Amino acid sequence: MSGNVQLLNDTLAAAKSEGRAALIAYLPAGFPTVTGGIEAVKAALDGGADVVEVGLPHSDPVLDGPVIQTADDIALRGGVRIADVMRTVREAHEATGKPILVMTYWNPIDRYGVERFTAELAEAGGAGCILPDLPVQESALWREHADKHGLATVFVVAPSSRDARLAEITAVGSGFVYAASLMGVTGTRASVGAQAEDLVRRTRATTDTPVCVGLGVSNAAQAAEVAGFADGVIVGSAFVKRMLDAPDDAAGLEGVRALAADLAKGVRGQA
């Protein structure tokens, strides 16, 4: 079975044709439970997200701030496994028809087996994978299997990436380029920063692939700011925080849906 890279490409192109940025939500699998995590993904999509990244929780998430680490810890204590990530992708995609990616560090895939992981992700209806710590020069095996199974390979670029490095990354990536707008770990910050705009400009000089910005957006005004210069706005910690701060799971889901609706206005310039 082929994965849904084309659905991802079409979704991003449709947003562009509407003169807006795409809204991409990040939520960890297994948080607060596997079923609850699936409901959260569906709530984000119902609220207005175009795409969702499902995180594979990791015990040492080097790029993630305290909010996502807390959610990952809850998911790991609950015993979340790769099979649960695949179930999350499958059920969310079947319920919504929207593109779902997995965001994961390389080590779990390496242990699980690249062919097994890509085949199962495609079979679940996944659109691709974001691999923040996989160096491009070590990605040939992954890309071979991802291409075979119709999955996007999304690499992360940062303000510290030199122009030659950006060209190297964008030459082999697919789906979109994940531009990390601030150096350091994920979280919500007061200002997304001018660094992001410069990074998008430099990345676009090397590719026609959409460039989406993550790390720092938490409200409609910030989403509108980023949507002014990027092809997509990626929001993670703000969704997770809504769930962590909620008095119960139902309120958490409503918080996710409401935030997605607010951000969806932002990417349309209605903030």
From Swiss-Prot:
Superkingdom in the source lineage: Bacteria
Active site: residue positions: 53, 64
UniProt pathway: Amino-acid biosynthesis; L-tryptophan biosynthesis; L-tryptophan from chorismate: step 5/5
EC number per UniProt: 4.2.1.20
Matches recorded under CDD domains: Tryptophan_synthase_alpha (cd04724)
Keyword terms of this UniProt record: Amino-acid biosynthesis, Aromatic amino acid biosynthesis, Lyase, Tryptophan biosynthesis
GO molecular function: tryptophan synthase activity
Gene Ontology terms describing biological process: L-tryptophan biosynthetic process
Pfam families for the chain: Trp_syntA
GO cellular component: cytosol
Catalytic activity of the protein: (1S,2R)-1-C-(indol-3-yl)glycerol 3-phosphate + L-serine = D-glyceraldehyde 3-phosphate + L-tryptophan + H2O
PROSITE patterns: TRP_SYNTHASE_ALPHA (PS00167)
Family of the protein in this entry: Belongs to the TrpA family.
NCBIfam families hit by this protein: trpA
Task of the protein: The alpha subunit is responsible for the aldol cleavage of indoleglycerol phosphate to indole and glyceraldehyde 3-phosphate.
Complexes and interactors: Tetramer of two alpha and two beta chains.
Protein name: Tryptophan synthase alpha chain
Annotated organism of origin: Streptomyces coelicolor (strain ATCC BAA-471 / A3(2) / M145)
Gene coding for it: trpA
